């Protein structure tokens, strides 16, 4: 997974958006709910970069540091 600063910023934005949407909908903000929201955004976007950002953000929420290849 490429973790340049711009991509990290986009993933953090996607994660924050997911948390805000859950909070504003009075839904529980759990790891599973955030992952589901990120996957929903991935499916809804037509933008290839957006799909990748949401996929990678969901993977980091799901796996933590195991999602990042060693050596980066």
Give the ranges of each region predicted by the language model.
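Charged, solvent-exposed alpha-helical segments that act as regulatory interaction surfaces
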Residues: 28, 66-67
């Amino acid at each position: 997974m490429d973790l340049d600063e711009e991509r990290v910023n986009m993933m953090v934005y996607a994660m924050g958006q997911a948390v805000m949407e859950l909070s504003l909908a009075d839904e529980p903000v759990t790891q599973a709910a955030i992952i589901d929201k990120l996957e929903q955004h991935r499916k809804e976007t037509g933008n290839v970069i957006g799909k990748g950002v949401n996929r990678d953000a969901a993977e980091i929420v799901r796996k933590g540091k195991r999602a990042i290849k060693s050596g980066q």
